Amino acid sequence: GTNKWDRPLFERHFWPNFWQKAKFGYDGVARDNTGRGVAFVRPTTYMIYDIWDNCGGDIRNSEVNIARKFYAPYVLKGGVEVKDYDTTYVTPVVLTDGTEIEVRLKPGDEIKKEWWTSASDTMTSYFPRFFKFGTDKHIDGKPDNGFVPDWYIFRVADTYLLRAEAYLKAGNKGGAVKDVNTVRERAKASLINENQLDIDYILDERARELLGEEQRFMTLSRMNMVYQRTKKYGRNVSAASIQEYNNLLPIPQSAIDSNLEAELRQNEGY
């Protein structure tokens, strides 16, 4: 079973930990709008940026769904955030071209992306926050308890996209486009035509719609595309080490040993 502490601990893994860094006014104290992320998991560049190119009015990419901006914190007085504009936060920053600058921010000022210059900045501290993994609600109203959104169990969009995939493989591109556009129309995204649709587009649409809900590996595995897509979009360590046989997972040895009526062969490569 689970209790009220399990999910906040899990969801903290997906949240950036900018609140812990002694930069731009943050001091390691969790605030209501920061949560208490530990950044154990960061989405890929493909997920954060690539699939949103030319997305137009797609509400799935709106700032309320994917928060891409960060702001200097308000001052904490007695555990309460106060809009004290007499405070100025001073942070030395070395830009990517080597220029040294001094960033001076008032509470509520935006922390500009060009000031995120270290690997630590972009990998753990200041990557976009997906509100599928967090809301502004906290257990018992305490910001250090993390963010706890409701989780979806069934999604009709998943059904449409599965059928679109089936239509495409059956040669019915018109039916596939219609199903994909049903999902996109709900999201206020621009509609597509048959010339734009292929299996990669359907996978992109699944990512936009079902991030954090579907098991992406299982989707790619049944398509026999784990190797191909990891090589194309995975981070360096994953792309360098993955092998074609990794499209399938190994069969547990206990399952092989317990199958007494016939020989159960291990998947190739394991």
PLM features: residue spans?
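Extended glycan-interaction surfaces of carbohydrate-active proteins
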Residues: 88-146, 224-228
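Selective for proline/serine-rich intrinsically disordered segments
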Residues: 6, 41, 90, 105, ...
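An aromatic- and glycine-enriched ligand-binding surface/loop that stacks and positions planar moieties
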Residues: 1-99
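Long, intrinsically disordered, low-complexity segments
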Residues: 1-31, 128-129, 136, 143-153, ...
